[in-house]
Amino acid sequence: MIRAHRNAVIAELETRLPGAVFKSYSAAAKAPTVSRYAVVFIGRASKPRTRFTGGQWRDIYTVTVHSVGSDEDLALWVEERVALLTGVKLTVTGRNVWPVEYITGQPLNLDDDGTRPLWFTVSQFDIVSDPA
């Protein structure tokens, strides 16, 4: 189920960043001509009970998106498109997904560890998902 939610996020971001959304940095590295892109990571943040005596049906996923660019402006350009994920109601088969909530972010920073320095910023979102 976690991959279905990740894939829904990637599909939504692809509408704004065609060919520039990846599920890992290794996948992004296979597209070396891309000067700006987003990398999506997802993890289950919690599985709370919706009722005191009920089961743990609800899933809450935290999505972390790295917006990357070859310069500061390109990284921020990607981040502006990633931010539009806020409020979107994703479609995941068999689930009732609530609108995406923006949680937090990190400011623009430089990663100069590699052979080619890249600028990046980080955004985090929560996705609340109930069985349909």
State the predicted function of each range:
Residues 55-74, 118-129:
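Oligomerization/assembly interface segments of phage tail-like spikes and tubes
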Residues 2, 74, 114:
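Aromatic-acidic/polar surface patches that form glycan- and anion
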Residues 50-56, 112-116:
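Short, solvent-exposed beta-strand/turn "edge" segments of beta-rich domains on protein surfaces
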Residues 70-87:
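Mid-chain, well-packed structural core segment of small domains
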Residues 27, 43-47, 68-70, 128-132:
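Generic structural motif
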Residues 1-53, 88-96:
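Small/polar-rich, solvent-exposed N-terminal microdomains that initiate assembly or binding
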